[in-house]
């Protein structure tokens, strides 16, 4: 039994004394102990070495004590497993030297045996669960098929992902074949993550907001929903779409347990758009953690008041930034724990 099950209760929509709190990218570059390991080991060594991934996962639990842990990994381990080369340039981001640009490129992409290609992730989960000792739940995650495809086609990060969008619009059949391959791999991967010990799953649709509402349905939501349908009976699923407020109504009708919201959509509007029944997660502007600590705490309490304490998970509206002072991150978590006291 998980000792602190606030997060799991919120996912079920149960009444809680206070909402749970965790932060996207909480195992990250704002922590000096994370920087110490980053300086010794390259990015994918940290991801692919279970002992390192587990240690990085529990660092924020020790330091700022959120109500859930999220496994240290990366969304791009999935395309790596599918035979797409992925490099990570420190302080720059991902670089894929052989981007997918043709139908022939799509045909070369494999749907792998996830045990053979991603076994290190499942080993990291088992090790992390031992280290957590059932203190808090463990979240596993994956990128949405559309977001993975953005990197696979673009070859790197982008402000517009026009190459990825152009591929969808000029070669829609090939795009759908690629999206389905990514979806099938992701379902197998996340299923094994749950079997290995993850208590919930989050799907990151980081670039969903790049699409129009109509294109979002065709190229992103259709595939996210396949993943939800495949997993909903075995684990709670959270969907976070950055800039995807326009899809909250559709998402709210799905079997997802919770929906992540970014800071551009107000709590009340998010409740209204999502239908008012599903648990919401978010949506503190990560840059706001640079505010003075009393301001952070005041704003967190106001945010909880607006969302309501039930069917709500306190989080940021995107990942925590590397330049956030640790005591400010801890103040964010502490503010939630002080709510209603």
Curated annotation (Swiss-Prot):
Keyword vocabulary terms for this entry: Cytoplasm, Decarboxylase, Lyase, Porphyrin biosynthesis
Gene3D superfamilies: 3.20.20.210
Catalytic activity as recorded in UniProt: uroporphyrinogen III + 4 H(+) = coproporphyrinogen III + 4 CO2
Pfam families reported for this sequence: URO-D
UniProt pathway annotation: Porphyrin-containing compound metabolism; protoporphyrin-IX biosynthesis; coproporphyrinogen-III from 5-aminolevulinate: step 4/4
The UniProt record lists the keyword Transmembrane helix: no
Site description Transition state stabilizer, residues in chain: 74
InterPro entries associated with the record: UROD/MetE-like_sf (IPR038071), Uroporphyrinogen_deCO2ase_HemE (IPR006361), Uroporphyrinogen_deCOase (IPR000257)
One cellular component (GO) term of this entry: cytosol
Coiled coil ranges: none
GO biological process entries: protoporphyrinogen IX biosynthetic process
Statement: the UniProt record of this protein carries the keyword Lyase: yes
Compartment(s) where it occurs, according to its Swiss-Prot or TrEMBL record: Cytoplasm
Complex and partners: Homodimer.
Role description: Catalyzes the decarboxylation of four acetate groups of uroporphyrinogen-III to yield coproporphyrinogen-III.
Family listed: Belongs to the uroporphyrinogen decarboxylase family.
HAMAP family: URO_D (MF_00218)
The protein, known as: Uroporphyrinogen decarboxylase
